[in-house]
Amino acid sequence: MSTLEPAAQSKPPGGFKLWLSQLQMKHGRKLVIALPYIWLILLFLLPFLIVFKISLAEMARAIPPYTELMEWADGQLSITLNLGNFLQLTDDPLYFDAYLQSLQVAAISTFCCLLIGYPLAWAVAHSKPSTRNILLLLVILPSWTSFLIRVYAWMGILKNNGVLNNFLLWLGVIDQPLTILHTNLAVYIGIVYAYVPFMVLPIYTALIRIDYSLVEAALDLGARPLKTFFTVIVPLTKGGIIAGSMLVFIPAVGEFVIPELLGGPDSIMIGRVLWQEFFNNRDWPVASAVAIIMLLLLIVPIMWFHKHQQKSVGEHG
């Protein structure tokens, strides 16, 4: 005689799964929005606060090589803030020259990247759809190689018996090798080469979003191609130009590897000064003060870019 088994009943979800599903239903949107803020706090705000704390300390022969800001002794809390690290930056002209040269090199390099990157982005945007992805790949492909290896490759190209000088001697353009390596010119070449893709991609994105009926209307109304370019196309791609300029200018200010390997003793950029203070002099408080001032200088273009983005969003809806 067969026995009838009771129908299998579905088990209620476990306590943790039930709690997780309820949390997702109630606060899922807030959690998704909170993730980037947590990322920014952990990787940007927290390191900034640590560097700022070190900048207010004093140098010490210890590990780590700085004093603590707060000490508890004899039942009392003593707080020691040292502003002398920031005052030292104003006393020594080396730091001012390093800031000034870093801003100058970054600005000129950004302008050169724009002159090279805009035609490249234009060529990619107006190429056939079948070849567009290949051209984009060629723009991005060098970035897949180690940055250090690419800079070392430029050392081989620019040195006195390198590829460039040998080629110019073979053509008969020059009679003796040109001194390019370990000069400011080599620094400009290295930075422009390294950061051109960061200029090309935002401009390319802006170019493919243009409504070219506006360009045709300008030409139909009698505007010449050059005037149409500067009065119609350039304003429509202004967002891409500004975004690309920020992507080039901001990292170029603090560049260390390129000035160290391609530059000479006159290439005094803030990245080299930071390395000197941190690792050679082991003066972490002064190095932290140098880094804080550099970050404050970079906040100005970042805020300007943010203001422009908000203005663009307001104009377009």
UniProtKB/Swiss-Prot annotation:
It is found in: Cell inner membrane. One of its GO terms (biological process) is transmembrane transport. It comes from the Bacteria. The chain crosses the membrane at residues 32-51, 105-124, 134-153, 185-204, 240-259, 285-304. The keyword Transmembrane applies. Residues 99-305 form the ABC transmembrane type-1 domain. GO terms for cellular component: ATP-binding cassette (ABC) transporter complex; ATP-binding cassette (ABC) transporter complex, substrate-binding subunit-containing; membrane; plasma membrane. It is a multi-pass membrane protein. Residues 52-104, 154-184, 260-284 are periplasmic. Part of the ABC transporter complex PotFGHI involved in putrescine uptake. Responsible for the translocation of the substrate across the membrane. Imports putrescine for maintenance of the optimal concentration of polyamines necessary for cell growth in the presence of glucose. Belongs to the binding-protein-dependent transport system permease family. CysTW subfamily. This is Putrescine transport system permease protein PotH. The lineage of its organism: Bacteria, Pseudomonadati, Pseudomonadota, Gammaproteobacteria, Enterobacterales.
